[in-house]
């Protein structure tokens, strides 16, 4: 978009600056942010799960520049019946009126505790990351599914259980003719990075199943990888993605029996499966990409009318 962007990793700064005088490294973080702003003179500060940034720091920055805009994006689930409901709501509301806008991957109207000036954003795709075209390959496996016990947690956590395991195990039991490729459960470790890309390249279809009860528009960022790499993507209809993604781009299902029927249907119908997969990838990369999401964030934060169309902005 032509903007000059300076990224600061709060976690890296904290990790490198723990000492007797700064036990958790957070004092150094606040000073680094303020000093950096003094040199960089940003027009906008965008927070992304930066839980260690103090409200007092933002207050000081806004006093330095009355025109400074501060916004945040938040990708974790916010549904009342989802994981970490209380914790996530405390995190997202931490800075209160110091924020000019908030962007979430859940429909704001479906969140129990309303967030001022909040907007929905989809999990963005990026053609530099989503590079596969699985619909052009004869994939070894039918259905890919991956989960973990935490963001980028490298291995399974002992004693940790996820309700999705029950659903997936039941689905596999009902469909023994479907070749599943499943990670993050049943003693199979999660996959990340380049290894994830290698594994996902071997499946023609993917199941987008997030933690907790389905809530309107919420999905983990896995959805961008499924669509973006050309897998036929299956999504619970209660998520309501058909509000802005055409029905010829993915497959809705309403329960495990419906999902089983459709898995078998598209396992057999390669032509239709590949047609939908290709349409889904084309749509997601064109209309739900990182450039458009970035423009949307800035247009709402600075209140300007963009020349772009945002299909998710109803």
What are these regions (language model features)?
Residues 261-314:
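C-terminal amphipathic helix plus adjacent low-complexity
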Residues 71-86, 94, 102-103:
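Glycine-rich beta-alpha loop elements in corrinoid/cobalamin-binding modules
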Residues 1-20, 24-28, 32, 40, ...:
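Nucleotide-sugar donor-binding catalytic core of glycosyltransferases
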């Amino acid at each position: 978009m032509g903007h000059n962007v300076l990224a600061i990793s709060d976690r890296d700064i904290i990790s490198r600056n723990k000492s007797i005088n700064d036990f958790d490294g957070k004092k150094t973080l606040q000073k680094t942010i303020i000093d950096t702003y003094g040199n960089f003179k940003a027009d906008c500060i965008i927070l992304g799960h930066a839980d260690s940034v103090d409200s007092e720091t933002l207050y000081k920055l806004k006093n330095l520049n009355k025109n400074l805009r501060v916004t945040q994006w938040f990708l974790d689930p916010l549904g009342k019946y989802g994981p970490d409901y209380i914790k996530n709501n405390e995190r997202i509301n931490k800075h209160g009126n110091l924020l000019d806008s908030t962007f979430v991957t859940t429909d704001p109207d479906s969140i129990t505790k309303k967030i001022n000036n909040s907007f929905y954003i989809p999990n963005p795709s990026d053609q530099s990351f989503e590079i596969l075209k699985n619909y052009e390959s004869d994939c070894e496996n039918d259905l890919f599914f991956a989960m973990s016990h935490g963001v980028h947690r490298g291995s399974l956590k002992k004693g940790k259980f996820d309700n999705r395991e029950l659903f997936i195990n039941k689905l596999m039991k009902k469909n023994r003719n479907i070749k599943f490729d499943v990670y993050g459960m049943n003693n199979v470790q999660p996959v990340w990075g380049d290894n994830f890309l290698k594994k996902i390249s071997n499946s023609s279809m993917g199941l987008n199943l997030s933690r907790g009860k389905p809530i309107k528009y919420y999905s983990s960022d896995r959805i961008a990888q499924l669509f973006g790499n050309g897998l036929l993507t299956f999504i619970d209809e209660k998520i309501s993605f058909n509000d802005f993604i055409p029905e010829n781009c993915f497959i809705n299902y309403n329960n495990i029996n419906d999902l089983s029927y459709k898995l078998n249907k598209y396992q057999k119908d390669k032509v239709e499966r590949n047609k939908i997969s290709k349409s889904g990838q084309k749509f997601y990369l064109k209309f739900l990409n990182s450039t458009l999401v970035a423009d949307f964030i800035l247009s709402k934060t600075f209140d300007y009318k963009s020349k772009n169309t945002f299909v998710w902005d109803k």
